[in-house]
Each structure stands twice: as structure tokens, then as C-alpha cells.
């Protein structure tokens, strides 16, 4: 058996979008019911990919403004980011491009990002929207549009509560590291030049 490859995967996104629940749901198949804001936490999972073992180091971060100076310390050495927003929070969706992409580009340029829409189970929950009249759901099309805007190789919608697509999120993160998407090479100006003979 070959030595396992280590992948550092860091979750980022606004507070209360479900980053910790996503990690706990993935690593223990349980859904925590109490909300306790994260300062910093670490999880680990061994995953077999194409017959090889991958040790997936999962770093949980605090989305709250209070931790803006502390949070980037976890970015060093990251192989991939899971950038999460809530499918029932327009503010968290808007902060992907307003706050998180600038932060990641500044502290970890070139590291791939998997965009994740969380709380999928609540998007079609009529009772939730009756109880929260100001909430606006984010559509799959809006998520895809945001993925293209930020240049993320993957966009996945999931529910930590029902486990729907939870494994797919981390499979995508591993795949992005092990099989990076081919980037289109831009032609240099010399190649674009027209020659008149």
C-alpha cells in the first residue's frame, strides 16, 4: 500500500452558514443541533481515492468579523478551500464575492476553491420562509453564476442535516487537488499578432 497523500482543506464562509455542521456531518455522520460559534477546530478523515489513501485534514474557521485577523493563520499550506454560503441567506451569498474571494486571493492566491451552498433542506421548506419572512432563497442557477464569477471549478449544494451531497463536497475538494482542472493557456501578444508578407 502506498503512503497516503495529505490534503489540507480549509472551510471558510460567513458565521452560521453551516461550516462546522458540514464537517461533523461528513466525519461522524451526525448532525449537531446546538449552534456554538467556532473559533478554530480541526478534523481528519482517511479517504480511499482510486485505491490510494488520502488523509484529508479539515480545518474549520470562524466566519465572524471578530476573527478577521486570526482566521488567515489557518490558510497557510491549504491545498483547497471549501467556501460555503447558506442557500437561505442572501447576505452570505453576496459575501462570497464581496468578502471571501478578496480575502482568499490576498492570503492564498492560486489555491482552488469549491463553492458550496449549505442548508439545501431548508430552501424548499415553506414553514421556514413563513417563520422568516425576510429570507430569500438562492437558486441553483444563482449558485452556478457565482461559481463562474469567482472561477471555482465546482459548485455543490448540500444538506448536512439530511446528508444530501455531503460526501460529494469533499470528493470534489479531493478531486480538485488530485486532478486539477486544465487551465486555458492565454496566447501571448506575439502569437496573436498578424503578419503581413
UniProtKB/Swiss-Prot annotation:
The protein's predominant localisation is: cytoplasm
Q: This chain belongs to which protein, by name? A: Rac-like GTP-binding protein RHO1
Q: Which PANTHER family match?
A: RHO FAMILY GTPASE
Localisation: Cytoplasm; Membrane
Q: Which UniProt keywords apply?
A: Cytoplasm, GTP-binding, Lipoprotein, Membrane, Methylation, Nucleotide-binding, Prenylation
Cross-referenced CDD domains, in alphabetical order?
Rop_like
> Transmembrane residues, as ranges?
none
Q: According to Swiss-Prot or TrEMBL, what is its membrane topology?
A: Peripheral membrane protein
State the similarity comment: Belongs to the small GTPase superfamily. Rho family.
| Propeptide span(s) | 195-197
| GO function terms (MF aspect) | GTP binding; GTPase activity
Give residues where Cysteine methyl ester occurs: 194
Q: Name one GO biological process term.
A: small GTPase-mediated signal transduction
According to its UniProt entry, the function of this protein is described as: Inactive GDP-bound Rho GTPases reside in the cytosol, are found in a complex with Rho GDP-dissociation inhibitors (Rho GDIs), and are released from the GDI protein in order to translocate to membranes upon activation.
Cellular-component GO terms for this entry: cytoplasm; membrane
Where is GTP bound in this sequence?
13-20, 60-64, 118-121
Where in this protein would one find the motif Effector region, according to its record? 35-43
Note one Pfam family from the annotation.
Ras
List the source organism. Answer: Beta vulgaris
Q: Where is the lipid attached (S-geranylgeranyl cysteine)?
A: 194
From what superkingdom does this record's organism come?
Answer: Eukaryota
Amino acid at each position: 500500500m502506498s503512503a497516503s497523500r495529505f490534503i489540507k482543506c480549509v472551510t471558510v464562509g460567513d458565521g452560521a452558514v453551516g461550516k462546522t455542521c458540514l464537517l461533523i456531518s461528513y466525519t461522524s455522520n451526525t448532525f449537531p443541533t446546538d449552534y456554538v460559534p467556532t473559533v478554530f477546530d480541526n478534523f481528519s478523515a482517511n479517504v480511499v481515492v482510486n485505491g490510494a489513501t488520502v488523509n484529508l485534514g479539515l480545518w474549520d474557521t470562524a466566519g465572524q468579523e471578530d476573527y478577521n485577523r486570526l482566521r488567515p493563520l489557518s490558510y497557510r499550506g491549504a491545498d483547497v478551500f471549501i467556501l460555503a454560503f447558506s442557500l437561505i441567506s442572501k447576505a452570505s451569498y453576496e459575501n462570497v464575492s464581496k468578502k471571501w474571494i478578496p480575502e482568499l486571493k490576498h492570503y492564498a492566491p492560486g489555491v482552488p476553491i469549491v463553492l458550496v451552498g449549505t442548508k439545501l433542506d431548508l430552501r424548499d421548506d415553506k414553514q421556514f420562509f413563513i417563520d422568516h419572512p425576510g429570507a430569500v432563497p438562492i437558486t441553483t442557477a444563482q449558485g452556478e453564476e457565482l461559481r463562474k464569477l469567482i472561477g471555482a471549478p465546482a459548485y455543490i449544494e448540500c444538506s448536512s442535516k439530511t446528508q444530501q451531497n455531503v460526501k460529494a463536497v469533499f470528493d470534489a475538494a479531493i478531486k480538485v487537488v488530485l486532478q486539477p482542472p486544465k487551465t486555458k493557456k492565454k496566447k501571448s501578444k506575439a502569437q496573436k499578432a498578424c503578419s503581413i508578407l
